[in-house]
Amino acid sequence: MRKLLVLLSFLSVGFSQINDKNFKSEINGGVTVCVFTSEWQEQPFDKDIVKGVKGYQDAEIIYIKSEEAPKVTKKLRLRNFPSMVLFYDGSKKETWKADMDGELDIDNKDIKSAIDDVLAEDVF
C-alpha cells in the first residue's frame, strides 16, 4: 500500500497540468520555454524544434494546453498554435508564434541563441 501511495504521488507531480493558477510558479526560476498547444491547432507540434533545448543552460520545457490556461494565453496574445514563449525568472523574453497554417518557423538553434542572449543580458 505504501508503495502504491508513493507511486501515485510521484505520478501526480510528474504529470501536473499547467493552468492559470499555477503558471507563474512554474515559470519562476531560471530559463523556461513554454510550448502552447491547442486541441484545434492546424499542425501537430514538431518536438524536434525543442530537441536539445531541455537542460541547455539549465532550461526547462513545459507544455501548456491553451484550453487549460485561457487567461495566460490571452495575456500573451497567442492566437495561433503551436506557439512558444521564453521566460527568464518569470519575465517574458521572447515569443515565437505560429503562422495561420500552424507552422513555427524556428529551430532549436534559434531557441538556444535566444537563451544565450537572455543570459548575456543578466551579466551586466
What do these predicted ranges mean?
Residues 76-88:
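Structural micro-motif
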Residues 39-42, 67-69, 91-93:
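Solvent-exposed loop/turn segments at secondary-structure junctions
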Residues 3-13:
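Sec-dependent N-terminal signal peptides
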